A protein has these predicted regions:
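Short, compositionally biased leader-like segments
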Residues: 143-163
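Conserved glycine-rich "GG(E/T)P / GGGxP" loop and the immediately following alpha-helix
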Residues: 12-18, 23-150
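N-terminal [4Fe-4S]-dependent radical SAM core
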Residues: 1-14, 54, 168-170, 178
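Accessory C-terminal segments flanking Radical SAM cores
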Residues: 157-233
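Catalytic cores of phosphodiester-bond-cleaving enzymes
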Residues: 1, 31, 204-206
Length: 233
């Protein structure tokens, strides 16, 4: 999970404009790949975003899919977000092996004042120029962050994979993180604080108003079921 600077606002919201990716990681929770070209409906997203109460938004993220190979499709969605809202982008870092892609991607990130978060599992690192990224992180001094290696959870393609344990660590109950919500290309909005299942909270055709209450209701029901299940063991 990406860590964001806490400002007292309760929601970190993200948009996944596409699941198109130049990698096919065995553990991808969103089943991203070079063949997955499904994209988010811009008009419906624009209507939904126009109803946001921006006082509730701590930070706004973009990922998917790999943003660096599809910036022209991400661009219209980025432009929907008010300039004063902190933004971050999560990338697999493959752009670092090409001078041309590096320049294009970093210029795009600078244009939108993105905090850049680079995935750092062994499966990502082998497709990166890691030394370059480490030096760049020092040079940009906080603007680019190399993630700690993610713990692989039983979601997406990792579900049922040998060595991946399906468990619940009740991370939904942590008080040091905001509510994390992500809009997927199919229009579903999922709760992303969980290490197990990403519950669908609503769609982008529903109202933004009440999204926190709906999230808390779904999470509370799941938490109660987990506690009751543990007590029966």
């Amino acid at each position: 999970m990406a860590e964001t600077l806490q400002t007292g606002k309760p929601i970190d919201f993200s948009i996944m404009p596409s699941f198109y990716c130049n990698l096919r990681c065995w553990f991808c929770m969103y089943d991203c790949s070079p063949e997955n070209r499904r994209v988010l409906d811009y008009k419906k997203t624009k209507v939904f975003i126009s109803k946001f109460d921006w006082k509730l938004i701590n930070a706004f993220g973009f990922y998917g899919g790999e943003p660096s190979i599809f910036t022209h499709s991400y661009e219209p969605f980025v432009c929907l977000i008010p300039d004063e809202i902190p933004r971050f982008v999560i990338t697999n870092g493959t752009w670092s092996v090409s001078e041309d892609y590096t320049e294009l991607f970093l210029n795009w990130c600078a244009k939108h004042r993105f905090h850049i978060i680079v995935s750092s599992t062994p499966d990502h690192i082998k497709y990166q120029n890691r030394v370059f990224l480490e030096n760049l992180a020092k040079e940009l001094d906080g603007a680019l962050e190399l993630k700690n290696p993610d713990e692989i959870h039983a979601q997406g393609r990792a579900k049922g994979h040998d060595g991946v344990i399906s468990d619940c660590k009740l991370t939904c109950q942590r008080t040091d993180r905001n509510i994390r919500l992500g809009l997927k290309p199919d229009g579903n909005i999922v709760f992303q604080n969980c290490h197990g299942e990403y519950h669908v909270v609503q769609t982008y055709e529903d109202e933004f108003s009440g999204i926190i209450e709906r999230t808390n209701q779904i999470v509370g029901k799941c938490y109660k079921q987990k506690i009751e299940k543990n007590e029966k063991r």
